[in-house]
From Swiss-Prot:
SUPFAM superfamilies: dUTPase-like
NCBIfam families, per the entry: dut, PRK00601.1
Reactions catalysed, as given in the entry: dUTP + H2O = dUMP + diphosphate + H(+)
Protein name, UniProt field: Deoxyuridine 5'-triphosphate nucleotidohydrolase
Signal peptide: none
Biological role stated in the UniProt entry: This enzyme is involved in nucleotide metabolism: it produces dUMP, the immediate precursor of thymidine nucleotides and it decreases the intracellular concentration of dUTP so that uracil cannot be incorporated into DNA.
GO BP term (any one): dUTP catabolic process
Listed cofactors: Mg(2+)
Keywords: Hydrolase, Magnesium, Metal-binding, Nucleotide metabolism
Gene Ontology terms for molecular function: dUTP diphosphatase activity; magnesium ion binding
Pfam families, sorted: dUTPase
Binding annotation for substrate: R72, S73, G74, N85, T89, V90, D91
Family: Belongs to the dUTPase family.
């Protein structure tokens, strides 16, 4: 495994006392993001509702990198709680707080408490492309087959 990429991070006042995001296993791809909501003010996410959950983090990604905010599989499987705009993209030039847009697709209300792991963040290199207008594109066996064209 190569040396880790350094990412500067700042915790906002409402995240004071919370740990920084961390990997939960030696081979984990994502850092777990933590809810930075008030200790005495848990967020109740009713069934079918969505909410923006603050993390209290501001990061400075190196040029040529992005962060993706993705669901935690356990929250989705057990409670139907997932990241609505998955994956959420954090660009290298963004300097605002990272918030997580959660939605409760389950049938019961879900309570989010301060310090709870709510999503995961993956940092990855970005490939930039240059689009070139073309009069025709090369044919492929698949052609224009879209949704469901390769099976169930």
């Amino acid at each position: 495994m190569s040396d880790p990429i350094k990412v500067d991070v700042r915790q906002l006042p409402h995240a004071e006392g919370l740990p920084l995001p961390s990997y939960q296993s030696t081979q984990a791809a994502g850092l777990d993001l933590i809810a930075a909501i008030g200790e005495q003010a848990p967020l109740v996410l009713a069934a079918g509702r969505r909410a923006m959950v603050p993390t209290g983090l501001v990061i400075a990604l190196p040029d040529g990198y992005e962060a993706q905010v993705r669901p935690r599989s356990g929250l989705a499987a057990r409670h139907g709680v997932t990241v609505l705009n998955s994956p959420g993209t954090v660009d290298a030039d963004y300097r605002g707080e990272i918030n997580v847009l959660l939605v409760n697709l389950g049938s019961e209300a879900f309570t989010i408490r301060r310090g709870e792991r709510i999503a995961q963040m993956i940092v990855a290199p970005v490939t930039r492309v240059e689009l070139v207008r073309a009069a025709a594109l090369p044919a492929t066996p698949r052609g224009s087959g879209g949704f469901g064209s390769t099976g169930r």
